[in-house]
Amino acid sequence: MTKSVIEILSAEEMRRTITRLASQIVEKAGDLTDLALLGIHTRGVPLAENIAKQIETLEGIAVPVGALDITFYRDDLDQIRVRTPSKTDIPFDLNGKNLVLIDDVIYKGRTIRAALNAVNDYGRPEVIRLAVLVDRGHRQLPIQPDFTGKKLPTAKEEKVKVYLQDLDGRDAVELIK
């Protein structure tokens, strides 16, 4: 069976969406002195870096960015293809931070549950919020993003593929049916 690919966000639409996410994060954060972004490997990391660049452009403040690997915190290791763990790099103290976890797509909520468990091993932020580029629904856990770039109702058998310039040489979001 041939799969069809539908572009959901073009490079320009992604740029605008990232700018909007940055603006929403700034508005909700209020005081930016304790704001920090933590991208979830793999695509959440460059996404967090792009959002941080936009915040700096908008506000003139450099927001610290970290990278979180959740491989060994997952509850579905027996069901997924195990990848080589990435490096967690958190170059700031999490304690007391206004932390925004960033991921490309939220689906069942299990990645975010694992990320929350991992964060607790590194410190205790004052508040943890969640920003995602795409929310495709079908949650299995009571986890919802605070900031969403695009809500995209999908069928369970469909896939959402995010392409990022830093990793893939282009920016786009596609729905694979």
Curated annotation (Swiss-Prot):
The keyword DNA-binding appears for this protein: no
Coiled-coil segments: none
Annotated motif PRPP-binding, positions: 99-111
Pfam families per UniProt: Pribosyltran
Broadest EC class assigned to this enzyme: transferase
Entry keywords, A to Z: Glycosyltransferase, Transcription, Transcription regulation, Transferase
MF terms in GO: uracil phosphoribosyltransferase activity
Keyword Transferase: yes
E.C. numbers: 2.4.2.9
Biological-process GO terms, alphabetical: regulation of DNA-templated transcription
Gene3D superfamilies assigned to the protein according to its UniProt record, in alphabetical order: 3.40.50.2020
Reactions listed under catalytic activity: UMP + diphosphate = 5-phospho-alpha-D-ribose 1-diphosphate + uracil
PANTHER family given in the database record: BIFUNCTIONAL PROTEIN PYRR
Family: Belongs to the purine/pyrimidine phosphoribosyltransferase family. PyrR subfamily.
Functional summary from the UniProt entry: Regulates the transcription of the pyrimidine nucleotide (pyr) operon in response to exogenous pyrimidines.
Name of protein: Bifunctional protein PyrR
Organism: Picosynechococcus sp. (strain ATCC 27264 / PCC 7002 / PR-6) (Agmenellum quadruplicatum)
